[in-house]
UniProtKB/Swiss-Prot annotation:
Keyword list, A-Z: Lipoprotein, Membrane, Myristate, Palmitate, Repeat, Vacuole
Any one Gene Ontology molecular-function term assigned to this protein's record: protein-membrane adaptor activity
Principal location class: membrane
Encoding gene, per UniProt annotation: vac8
Main function: Functions in both vacuole inheritance and protein targeting from the cytoplasm to vacuole.
UniProt ARM repeat ranges: 77-116, 118-157, 159-198, 200-239, 243-282, 284-323, 325-365, 409-448
Alphabetized PANTHER family for the sequence: VACUOLAR PROTEIN 8
Species for this entry: Neurospora crassa (strain ATCC 24698 / 74-OR23-1A / CBS 708.71 / DSM 1257 / FGSC 987)
Protein name: Vacuolar protein 8
Any Pfam family matching the protein: Arm
Protein location: Vacuole membrane
Length: 559
């Protein structure tokens, strides 16, 4: 990521190279080095005699020799980057501490080039490279600043280095240089700050160093790379609840800036802006603020793009925004329903499907009107078409959405006519506990106040052992929640006053026997909440027996 700002890597002419009188060893090293440079394509400067010649120049007291050494290191590392040992790195680190600007500039360029290699990243830090780089970041020379920051940017991509950099005192200078007037310095500094946002501890160090206001300010940069680095860094910072609170208190322009960036000409910036808003929208305040900042329009455009990362970031964001009840109607009115339904079938991306159906469920949560609009948009038809084929995580979301829609008395007949039993009943046999529970909850919601119970009769034994099989399995499961769902559903069916349906239940000896066992269950628990839940299940079972004309069974309830 870090870009070198060094452009001067040339050597000096042979004639009149040095005015000062050189030691014999230095004169010999210069002659050798010039010869090696003439055959640079075939010379390994990182070992043996070439490295010894370079090192002689490095440790000379002659500034011209030191400059030549640093420029040579910068040149050879520009075209030959590989893992090197301390014998190569120590001379370069020694040059970094030189007071001469030209030496500093070339040495930091060389080190930045070598810091592209994974092994070198670790060794540079182990050999104490951070301290001189931090000093160079505070240099008045822009080229030196640029190379030093670029090197730290590269070093910060290695996990082993991040915490060391965070504790080294580098974050303050990096934050200041992020405001540099030189775009190269700014890019390198914001890139380095981004690399420091991948762990909780480092993010906190970054916040403490005062990076947040700088990153927010730079969202309005005209440079796409700076926009991307700052947007991504803020997205990572917003993962933490404490940081979101800090952002809410101190950065009133943040949301509007991110909303504006969703209309950037750069897809990577658009994507990160939506993801940053997604992370912010973990909090209620931001869920509302994004809508108020006219964020729905740009999100809808991203949602309808053909670029998968944009779709994913937008649908993840709208999912979080849709959690707030006050946002349900604005999202629906903005035209999201049909595109969300279309996403369910237009991609096999599991994450996109999960976010899309979860959003539809959220939009249906608070009002029967919105439930009807979700149904009209074709959500249930699409779920029915796909639910038996999609991954388990998507099945769980789809069945949960149907269960929510089934809470509306006005929609129950529509749902039954759409044939949801064809998928809900088989899914009560799913290997997933969540899918089983959601499917059973949907069946339970549909069993209450339907009016016409003929579909329950028709599906009593089919498909997949029908309603009968589902009730029998759940009653026998030993799971208190599953038993509760099954008994509550049974009670709705028995209260339907549909004689044929009640007759089918009464003839199902397995079901009746299990209801009787539950009705006679003794409650022995030290937990009052468990007592209440268990007591309700027993009470429902007793009520079922009464409606079956077998209400003389004695139940023994303690407590």
């Amino acid at each position: 990521m870090g870009a070198s700002c060094s452009s001067c890597c040339g050597g000096k002419s042979r004639d009149g190279l040095y005015d000062n009188v050189l030691a014999d060893s230095e004169r010999e090293a210069v002659a050798d080095l010039l010869q090696y440079l003439e055959n640079r394509g075939e010379t390994d400067f990182f070992s043996g005699e070439p490295l010894r010649a370079l090192s002689t120049l490095v440790y000379s007291e002659n500034i011209d020799l030191q400059r030549s050494a640093s420029l040579t290191f910068a040149e050879i590392t520009e075209r030959d980057v590989r893992a090197v040992d301390r014998d190569t790195l120590e001379p370069i680190l020694f040059l970094l501490q030189n007071s001469d600007i030209e030496v500093q500039r070339a040495a930091s360029a060389a080190l930045g080039n070598l810091a592209v290699n994974t092994d070198n990243k670790v060794l540079i830090v182990q050999l104490g490279g951070l301290a001189p780089l931090i000093r160079q970041m505070m240099s008045p020379n822009v080229e030196v600043q640029c190379n030093a920051v670029g090197c730290i940017t590269n070093l910060a991509t290695h996990e082993d280095n991040k915490a060391k950099i965070a504790r080294s005192g580098a974050l303050g200078p990096l934050t200041r240089l992020a405001k540099s007037r030189d775009m190269r310095v700014q890019r390198n500094a914001t890139g380095a700050l981004l690399n420091m946002t991948h762990s909780d501890e480092n993010r906190q160090q970054l916040v403490n160093a005062g990076a947040i206001p700088v990153l927010v300010q730079l969202l309005s940069s005209t440079d796409v790379d700076v926009q991307y680095y700052c947007t991504t860094a803020l997205s990572n910072i917003a993962v933490d609840a404490n940081n979101r609170r800090k952002l809410a208190q101190t950065e009133p322009r943040l949301v509007q800036s991110l909303v504006n960036l969703m209309d950037s000409s750069s897809p990577k910036v658009q994507c990160q802006a939506a993801l940053a808003l997604r992370n912010l929208a973990s909090d209620e305040k931001y869920q509302l603020e994004i809508v108020r900042a006219s964020g729905l329009g740009p999100l809808l455009r991203l949602l309808q793009s053909s670029y998968l990362p944009l779709i994913l970031s937008a649908v993840a964001c709208i999912r979080n925004i849709s959690i707030h009840p006050m946002n349900e109607s604005p999202i629906i009115e903005a035209g999201f329903l049909k595109p969300l339904v279309d996403l369910l079938g237009s991609t096999d991306n599991e994450e996109i499907q999960c976010h899309a159906i979860s959003t539809l469920r959220n939009l249906a949560a608070s009002s029967d009107r919105n439930k009807a609009l979700v149904l009209e948009a074709g959500a249930v038809q699409k779920c029915k078409q796909l639910v038996l084929e999609v991954p388990v995580t998507v099945q769980s979301e789809m069945t949960a959405a149907i269960a929510v829609l089934a809470l509306s008395d006005e929609l129950k007949t529509n749902l039954l006519e759409l044939g949801v039993f064809e998928v809900l009943i088989p899914l009560t046999k799913s290997p997933s506990i969540e899918v089983q529970g959601n499917s059973a909850a949907a069946l339970g919601n549909l069993s209450s106040k339907v009016g016409d119970y003929s579909v329950f009769i028709h599906n009593w034994n089919e498909p997949s052992d029908g309603i009968h099989g589902y009730l029998s399995r759940f009653l026998a499961s030993g799971d208190a929640t599953f038993q509760h769902i099954a008994i509550w559903t049974l009670l709705q069916l028995l209260e339907s006053e549909d004689k044929k349906l009640i007759g089918l239940i009464g003839k199902s000896n397995d079901i009746v026997d299990m209801i009787r066992q539950i009705a006679n269950r003794q409650i022995e628990s030290d937990n009052e909440l468990e007592d209440d839940d268990e007591g309700e299940v027993v009470s429902l079972a007793q009520r079922c027996l009464e409606l079956l004309g077998q209400g003389n069974a004695k139940a023994h309830i303690e407590g």
